[in-house]
Amino acid sequence: MSEQVIIFDTTLRDGEQALQASLSVKEKLQIAFALERMGVDVMEVGFPVSSPGDFESVQTIARNIKNSRVCGLTRCVEKDIDVAAEALRVAEAFRIHTFIATSPMHIATKLRSTLDEVIERAIYMIKRARNYTDDVEFSCEDAGRTPIPDLCRVVEAAINAGARTINIPDTVGYTMPHEFGNIISSLYQHVPNIDKAIISVHTHDDLGLAVGNAMAAVHAGARQVEGTLNGIGERAGNCSLEEVIMAIKTRHNILNVHTNINHQEIYRTSQLVSQICNMPIPANKAVVGANAFAHSSGIHQDGVLKNRENYEIMTPESIGLKEVQLNLTSRSGRAAVKHRMEEMGYQDSDYNLDDLYSAFLKLADKKGQVFDYDLEALAFINRQQEEPEFYHLDYFSVQSGSSVMATASVKLICGEETQSEAATGNGPVDAVYQAINRITGYQVSLVKYQLTAKGQGRDALGQVDIVADYQGRRFHGVGLATDIVESSAQAMVNVLNNIKRAQQVEKEIQRLQQHNNQQQNDSKQQNSQETV
């Protein structure tokens, strides 16, 4: 029977340290509810003594969370522990997490103390925390650089004092997985009362080894892993909990452990943390990145279409994603193009695959990623990306400020005509988009907006990538300019041209259908006359 690995989330404490601005109480509570839905066992939600704002957020979360244990961090300082207990006492169940440094460097240069004094202080503070709760966690800060005999002394004393969870942090992300695994194994071998506590690990990613170290520790017997969603945290970040959780699930055959996480909530929670913290998830991020289940290579796409397990060790559905994504690029094969056309409802007889694939490769070489409406245009109206576009941005101006409603004037070249309109909006970009909608008559709604800086300093360009919805279909647009409002306008004009092309495709398909229907009717009439 497999053992449980406790998932200890510190997104709202250690993760928040990476943010340029602190989260509001409302934002923290929103993330806490998402973590609760995901099923984290323990959530560390702040450092109550650090500020009145942190105290308030810890207390608010403690009052509202019912199914996860709420934890507050403290130093080995009396006031820290007392304040944390005051903030947490409204919780259904809470934990006090106290820590002190144990490495020779930290003891000598930061604490200006001795190991014996550190142990004495830890014992006193653990006992003080036990006056408030039976659930006390103790951390040996910088355990990764603490000699193992010293670490064993500290851990044994902490357990005797009443700590029920002993956390072993690799505070500076220094250790290698085999070293870290050996530390955990050594504790099990040399600490006589180790069976009275759960061994936890808290790893940092300074050398890119946080998840590797955590997994080595689990393999060696650790039964709690601390980390954050998306690996956010100071410096290079923390251990990515979603990666640990899915590694445990995927490699259950060798680890023989499990978590109580609701895996279906992983993707949604990851996206929420990214949005609230304003920290975009890299496309190549394991498990939750945009490319984690996307396949661009023709060989890989063909293999996935035949059997997903050929190139997927876990399914997108297992983290709450609906389907695998095949990105159509110049590396995609004929099978992927044909599959995408079938997904859109087209049969082999509706188009010429040889001609379509040839045109697709030319467009993919120029454009990069090819979307559904591009394929349809190539298949039915033979429109290439380099042909003249119908809409062009001729002119725009924006007036906005803290005390005035944003107003935009926009002039578009629409084929051979020039049209202009003005509109107000919720900010300059929205005002421009409202004016564009008035000109075209399209009711286009923005689904996704992403701004990326290209270059540095005064010469930097702003690239805007958007996804917009029009009559239930998604269209992509890209704009690039030194002015982000201009690049936003260009991106929307790009969307409009894609919509225009899609409309031409629909007309051409209707024409072909009418032509085919007419041919069938003519054939029936001819057969009827011959019979007579």
UniProtKB/Swiss-Prot annotation:
Q: What is the name attached to this protein's record? A: 2-isopropylmalate synthase
- Subcellular location field: Cytoplasm
Q: Which Gene3D superfamilies match?
A: 1.10.238.260, 3.30.160.270, Aldolase class I
Region of interest (Regulatory domain), residue spans: 392-532
| Function of the protein | Catalyzes the condensation of the acetyl group of acetyl-CoA with 3-methyl-2-oxobutanoate (2-ketoisovalerate) to form 3-carboxy-3-hydroxy-4-methylpentanoate (2-isopropylmalate).
Q: Name any cofactors this protein relies on.
A: Mn(2+)
Q: Which family does it belong to?
A: Belongs to the alpha-IPM synthase/homocitrate synthase family. LeuA type 1 subfamily.
| Pathway noted in the entry | Amino-acid biosynthesis; L-leucine biosynthesis; L-leucine from 3-methyl-2-oxobutanoate: step 1/4
Q: Which domain of life is it from?
A: Bacteria
Enzyme Commission number(s) of this protein: 2.3.3.13
Signal peptide extent? none
InterPro entries attached to this UniProt entry: 2-IPM_HCS-like, 2-isopropylmalate_synth_dimer, AIPM/Hcit_synth_CS, Aldolase_TIM, LeuA/HCS_post-cat, LeuA_allosteric_dom_sf, LeuA_bact_synth, PYR_CT
Pfam families listed in its UniProt record: HCS_D2 (PF22617), HMGL-like (PF00682), LeuA_dimer (PF08502)
Annotated segments matching region Disordered: 513-532
Q: Does the keyword Aminoacyl-tRNA synthetase apply?
A: no
Q: Which UniProt keywords apply?
A: Amino-acid biosynthesis, Branched-chain amino acid biosynthesis, Cytoplasm, Leucine biosynthesis, Manganese, Metal-binding, Transferase
Reactions catalysed: 3-methyl-2-oxobutanoate + acetyl-CoA + H2O = (2S)-2-isopropylmalate + CoA + H(+)
Name one cellular component (GO) term: cytosol
Amino-acid positions noted as binding Mn(2+) in the UniProt annotation, renumbered to this chain: D14, H202, H204, N238
What broad class of enzyme is this? transferase
| Gene Ontology MF, one | 2-isopropylmalate synthase activity
- Quick check: keyword Transcription in the entry? no
- Residues annotated as coiled-coil are none
Q: Which residues form the Pyruvate carboxyltransferase domain?
A: 5-267
What is the species of this protein?
A: Pectobacterium carotovorum subsp. carotovorum (strain PC1)
Organism ancestry: Bacteria, Pseudomonadati, Pseudomonadota, Gammaproteobacteria, Enterobacterales
How the protein assembles, per its UniProt entry? Answer: Homodimer.
- Encoding gene per record: leuA
Q: Which GO terms describe its biological process?
A: L-leucine biosynthetic process
